[in-house]
From Swiss-Prot:
Catalytic activity field: guanosine(37) in tRNA + S-adenosyl-L-methionine = N(1)-methylguanosine(37) in tRNA + S-adenosyl-L-homocysteine + H(+)
The name this protein goes by in its record: tRNA (guanine-N(1)-)-methyltransferase
Enzyme Commission code: 2.1.1.228
Top-level lineage group: Bacteria
Entry keyword set: Cytoplasm, Methyltransferase, S-adenosyl-L-methionine, Transferase, tRNA processing
Quaternary organization: Homodimer.
Class of this enzyme: transferase
CC annotations in GO: cytosol
PANTHER family assigned to the protein according to its UniProt record, in alphabetical order: TRNA (GUANINE-N(1)-)-METHYLTRANSFERASE
General function of this protein: Specifically methylates guanosine-37 in various tRNAs.
Gene: trmD
Record organism: Dehalococcoides mccartyi (strain ATCC BAA-2100 / JCM 16839 / KCTC 5957 / BAV1)
Assigned protein family: Belongs to the RNA methyltransferase TrmD family.
């Protein structure tokens, strides 16, 4: 996958993507990241990319000309089709389902917002998608872009060392992950569930599924309501509710 990022602060992307999993992905040509400073496409003497809004009001807006020219230049260099994604608090909520959707593309073009936002013509005539990573305010879209890039890259075949790694992550199957334990078996008097030491893989898998259901039901009831439960899942949920009632 090729990912083009349009930003005013290209230096922000250097360190995070030169380490760990993403570096291996780029070294193995699984992901190609190209950063473009769209200030290079501002042609006045001050290289201004923003201006005050018509009708008045606080703040500045990103002008349409530099962004349109930047995207057009990127597509001229490489005409591979790609969704043009605005990172904006007005966008659809980013989640694992959206990450899977984006991972199916050969290429992404991501525009990082700043100031009070974009001239509306960018939204109407340039972008094809608009994404928000949450209901909070950031100084710019760079951190949001990093979140999207990281989440999407993990889903590209070959990026992770284990084929099961991304499938077992929280949210990948609609559930939060089950608890994990490693050595030592007892730490400061705190042990681990006996089933994990039993060697019985069927029982271990049952325990993991049950704890995923328990954790999702308790921490993310909104997610739990959307999960299609099998007959075995419903039995586990009944056990969980009975245990919770006993403890309560």
């Amino acid at each position: 996958m090729k990912i083009d990022v349009l930003t005013l602060f290209p230096e922000m992307f250097q360190s995070p993507f030169e380490e760990s999993i993403f570096k291996r992905a780029t070294d193995n040509n699984l992901v190609r990241l190209e950063i473009h400073n769209f200030r290079d496409f501002a042609h006045d003497k001050h290289h201004a990319v923003d201006d005050s809004p018509y009708g008045g009001g606080a703040g500045m807006l990103l002008k349409p000309e530099p962004l349109f020219e930047a995207v057009e230049d990127v597509l001229r260099e490489d005409p591979t089709p790609a969704p043009v994604i605005l990172l904006s608090p007005q966008g659809r909520s980013f989640n694992q389902e959206v990450a899977r959707e984006l991972a199916k593309h050969e290429r992404l073009i991501i525009i990082c917002g700043h100031y009070e936002g974009f001239d509306e013509r960018v939204r109407e005539h340039l972008s094809t998608d608009e994404i928000s990573i949450g209901d909070f305010v950031l100084t710019g879209g760079e951190l949001a872009a990093m979140v999207v890039i990281d989440a999407v890259s993990r889903l590209i075949p070959g990026v992770l060392g284990s084929g099961e790694s991304s499938q077992d992550d929280s949210h990948s199957n609609g559930l939060l992950e089950h608890p994990h334990y490693t050595r030592p078996p007892v730490f400061r008097g705190w042990g681990i569930p006996d089933v994990l030491l039993s060697g019985n893989h069927a029982q271990i898998n049952r325990w993991r599924r049950k704890e995923s259901l328990r954790r999702t039901l308790k921490r993310r009831p909104d997610m739990f309501e959307k999960i299609p439960l099998s007959k075995a899942d419903r039995k586990l949920v009944d056990e969980i509710l009975a245990e919770e009632n006993t403890q309560g």
